[in-house]
C-alpha cells in the first residue's frame, strides 16, 4: 500500500438517510476498501470525530438540525480545528451552492444520487487533485 493510499483510508460519513448510509457503507467499505464510520447527524459526527480520527470527512448537505455546512463550521471551530479534507455530497449543485461549499473549505462535491461502484474512485480523484 502506498503512502497516499494509507493517508486516506479512514472516512467519516455524515448522512441522515439510513438507506443512503447503507449504500454508502457498501460503496466505501466493500467496494472502496476504506475504513468508514457512518454518523446519522452532525452532532454525532462532533461526538465521534476525535475518537475515530478520520483522514477525510464526507458530508451530506441537507440534514435536519445541523446541516452539512453547519456541521463543517462546527468541526472547524473545535479546539484544534479540522485538519482533514472535506467533501460534500448533495443534489444541490447550482454554481452558487458549489461556490459556497468551496468557500467553507470543501475540496469538492460529489453529486447525489451517487454510483456506489465509483464513489471511492471519485473521492480518491478529489483528494489527488489537492
How would you name each of these model-derived features?
Residues 18-37:
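Two-component/phosphorelay signaling modules centered on CheY-like receiver
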Residues 15:
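Conserved acidic carboxylate
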Residues 1-12, 117-130:
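Non-catalytic signal-transmission and effector/linker regions of two-component phosphorelay proteins
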Residues 63:
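Receiver (REC) domain active-site loop signature in two-component systems and cognate sites
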Residues 38-56:
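Acidic, metal-coordinating helix/loop segments flanking the phosphotransfer/catalytic sites
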Residues 112:
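A Lys-centered signature of the CheY-like receiver
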Amino acid at each position: 500500500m502506498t503512502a497516499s493510499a494509507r493517508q486516506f483510508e479512514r472516512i467519516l460519513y455524515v448522512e441522515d438517510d439510513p438507506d443512503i448510509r447503507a449504500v454508502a457503507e457498501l460503496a466505501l467499505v466493500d467496494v472502496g476498501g476504506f475504513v468508514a464510520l457512518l454518523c446519522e447527524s452532525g452532532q454525532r459526527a462532533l461526538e465521534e470525530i476525535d475518537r475515530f480520527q478520520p483522514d477525510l470527512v464526507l458530508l451530506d448537505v441537507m440534514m435536519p438540525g445541523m446541516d452539512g455546512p453547519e456541521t463543517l463550521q462546527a468541526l472547524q471551530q473545535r479546539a484544534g480545528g479540522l485538519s482533514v479534507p472535506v467533501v460534500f455530497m448533495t443534489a444541490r449543485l447550482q454554481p452558487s451552492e458549489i461556490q459556497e461549499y468551496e468557500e467553507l473549505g470543501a475540496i469538492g462535491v460529489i453529486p447525489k444520487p451517487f454510483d456506489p461502484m465509483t464513489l471511492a474512485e471519485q473521492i480518491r480523484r478529489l483528494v489527488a487533485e489537492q
